[in-house]
Each structure stands twice: as structure tokens, then as C-alpha cells.
């Protein structure tokens, strides 16, 4: 090969690399805060891979149902920068959690005998037939509400078209930036909703879209969502009895932590109350800030500071939104006295094909908190 031809080949390779990077960047910004390009989810002539299919899907979707269409992109291995929500090894460590836990069960033995876990109880049972996710076999309606389990899918919570308060046809300005990262929209435009959540005037019946910001797709103590006002009320769109009725744990904009914030900030672990507010935050026990300015929230997504007395408890303080390793989609095992002895066990994780410590997002609970760490309810209530 001549030097000239070699130079041409190198130039072509460089351009190909740059184009690949460009396409990758565009792929990561597919929604970009609003409605994406239509053929990402729909097949205009029922030919998603060129040949015409025999039977079209509803709405000409590329999956057999809406959630399967979502998972065509959102299923895959997890990482700190992955937008996936369903893996095969429990590596999606996002704030919402991994739908992996809906596909697995395990058996352990206690004083009553063999106990088998119920995957229906580990998450929101979105129906995605192409990925083996089926209707909840236990609940026919949302606990604490009336939303039918047979209708539950990704679009029950997320607006796949990204409309804010009904979109432009309802008089809203066009969307120019994501609503998840505190970006400032260009003049004459608005930001999208946090994580494309539905609500407001979009016809979904959901409460007003909550205000929040996040640093990325993972969740750690130093990179995490900062939740503003309205998250509890939004969850109550389907689970209203849990936020309105008495004799249940309070949650919502008016449920201030008050003196419990002092407890949260001093609590490090069972028997260790040497914490300080500036470093007391743990992603295992989230809280909601009394804040509606998304730029302020965006500045808090890497904060290690705990709550003020005016911050409040919300549904996501104790639960995840998608799925978790624990009953009732909780963030930690609430059914065992000691977290280190909780379920799933290390052997359960191996048997399910999950990576080590996947239940706590890679955190070794015994190493971090000690062998005798009690429930993380004590982060606010310190009864241990």
C-alpha cells in the first residue's frame, strides 16, 4: 500500500469513528425531553426490518405491546451510564430499579419452613409480552387505588411522547431540553418533564408532573436524584389511599421531617450517631426537598448533605418506582431483624444469575454498616 493510499484509509477510518460517536450520542438523546422521531417506536408500513409482517401490532408499534416497544431499547445490561431498566443479571442500579426482579424467585427456610419469594410483589408488574413480563397475578388493581393491573405498562407512568401539560396542541411551548438535568430551555421553549413522567393536562389522569433532577442513570450516595415537590402526590394518582388515609405512614408535601431530620443527619449505623448533616445523605433513604426550582435541584444531585427540618418524606423514601429485590418494592429488606441476614441471600443471587450484592446496588451491607445493622427505618426513627 502506498503512503497516499494508507493516508486515505486512515482518514476514512477516522471519519467513520467520528460518525459512529456522533450516532451514539444521538442514540443516547433519543427522547431529548420530548417526542422522539416516530419510526423509533412505530413502523409506518408494518415493516420494522424491511419485510412486511403478517399481522400488524396495535398503533403500528415495533413491539407486540407498548411496554415491549419501550424495552426494545431499554432492556440490556446496566451500568452507571446505562438507560436500561431490565437486565438479565440485576445490574441496573438506577433510582427506579431493575425489572429483573419480576422475572426471578428464590426459596429460603425460616422457622415456619420453606418460603418462596413472589416476584409479583417485587415491582410494578408492567405487561411486556415480548420480554416475559406479565400481568400481576395477585393484585387486580393498584394497592390503595383502582388502576387496573391489566392495563399497567410503562406508559401508565411515562408519557412516551414527552408532552408537558397537554403539549403544544394544548397551548404549551415546544420542548427544547430534557426536564431531568436542570438544563435551561432556549427562549420561547420549555423543558420536558422529569423522566418523561405523565401528568397534568396530558389526559393520563395523573397528578401534576413532579419536579426533580438527576445526575445520570445510576444512583449512589454522591450521584443521585434530587426530588422536589410533588413526587408523593404524583404516586398517589394510583395509590391514593396511602397518602390520604389515617393510620398510615405520612407522605407528601405537607409531611415535614421536622425533628426527624436531626435524627437522619446524626444516624450513621446501628449504634453510631456521630453523623453530620453535610455528609449524612444515603441513597438508600431518599427525601423530598421543598423546592420547585429545577436548577436548584440540579445543583443538589451530587450533594452528600442530609435534609433540613422543612424537607419531607415521600413514597420514594422507602420504595423504588420500577422494582427491587425486596417485597413491596422497598429499598431495603424490611422483613428481617438484621440486614446482613436478610433475603435474598448471597447464594440466592448466584442461583438467579445476579451479580454480587445486586440487591443493594453493589453495597456490602455487613462491611458498610456492620453485622448487626437493623432496618433503615432507624435512619429517621432511631429505635435500634
Predicted regions located by residue number:
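Bacterial N-terminal signal peptides that target proteins for export
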Residues: 2-13
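Cleavable N-terminal signal peptides
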Residues: 15-17, 27
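A motif-centric signal for short, conserved binding hotspots located
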Residues: 28-384
Amino acid at each position: 500500500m502506498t503512503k497516499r493510499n494508507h493516508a486515505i484509509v486512515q482518514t476514512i477510518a477516522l471519519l467513520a469513528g467520528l460518525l459512529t460517536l456522533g450516532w451514539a450520542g444521538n442514540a443516547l438523546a433519543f427522547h431529548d425531553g420530548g417526542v422522539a422521531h416516530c419510526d423509533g417506536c412505530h413502523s409506518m408500513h408494518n415493516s420494522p426490518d424491511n419485510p412486511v409482517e403478517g399481522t400488524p401490532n396495535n398503533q403500528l408499534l415495533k413491539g407486540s405491546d407498548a411496554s415491549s416497544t419501550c424495552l426494545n431499547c431499554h432492556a440490556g445490561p446496566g451500568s452507571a451510564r446505562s438507560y436500561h431498566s431490565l437486565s438479565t443479571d440485576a445490574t441496573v442500579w438506577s433510582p427506579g430499579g431493575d425489572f429483573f426482579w419480576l422475572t426471578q424467585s428464590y426459596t429460603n427456610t425460616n422457622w415456619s419452613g420453606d418460603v418462596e419469594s413472589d416476584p409479583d410483589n417485587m415491582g410494578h408488574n408492567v405487561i411486556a409480552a415480548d420480554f416475559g413480563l406479565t400481568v400481576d397475578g395477585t393484585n387486580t388493581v393498584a394497592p390503595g387505588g383502582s388502576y387496573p393491573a391489566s392495563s399497567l405498562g410503562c406508559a401508565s407512568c411515562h408519557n412516551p411522547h414527552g408532552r408537558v401539560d397537554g403539549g403544544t396542541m394544548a397551548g404549551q411551548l415546544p420542548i427544547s431540553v430534557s426536564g431531568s438535568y436542570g438544563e435551561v430551555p432556549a427562549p420561547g421553549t420549555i423543558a420536558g418533564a422529569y423522566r418523561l413522567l405523565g401528568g397534568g393536562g396530558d389526559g393520563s389522569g395523573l397528578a401534576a408532573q413532579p419536579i426533580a433532577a438527576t445526575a445520570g442513570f445510576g444512583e449512589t450516595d454522591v450521584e443521585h436524584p434530587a426530588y422536589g415537590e410533588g413526587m408523593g402526590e404524583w404516586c398517589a394518582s394510583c395509590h391514593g389511599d396511602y397518602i390520604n388515609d389515617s393510620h398510615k405512614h405520612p407522605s407528601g408535601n405537607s409531611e415535614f421531617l421536622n425533628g426527624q431530620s436531626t435524627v437522619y443527619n446524626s444516624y450513621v449505623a446501628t449504634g453510631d450517631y456521630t453523623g453530620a448533616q453535610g455528609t449524612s445523605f444515603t441513597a438508600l433513604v431518599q427525601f423530598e426537598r421543598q423546592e420547585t426550582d429545577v436548577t436548584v435541584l440540579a445543583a443538589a444531585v451530587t450533594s452528600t448533605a442530609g435534609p433540613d427540618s422543612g424537607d419531607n418524606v415521600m413514597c420514594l423514601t422507602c420504595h423504588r418506582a420500577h422494582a427491587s429485590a425486596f417485597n413491596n418494592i422497598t429499598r431495603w429488606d424490611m422483613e428481617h431483624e438484621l440486614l446482613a441476614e436478610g433475603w435474598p441471600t448471597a447464594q440466592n443471587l448466584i442461583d438467579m444469575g445476579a451479580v454480587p450484592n445486586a440487591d443493594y446496588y453493589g453495597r456490602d451491607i455487613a462491611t458498610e454498616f456492620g453485622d448487626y445493622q437493623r432496618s433503615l427505618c432507624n435512619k429517621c426513627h432511631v429505635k435500634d
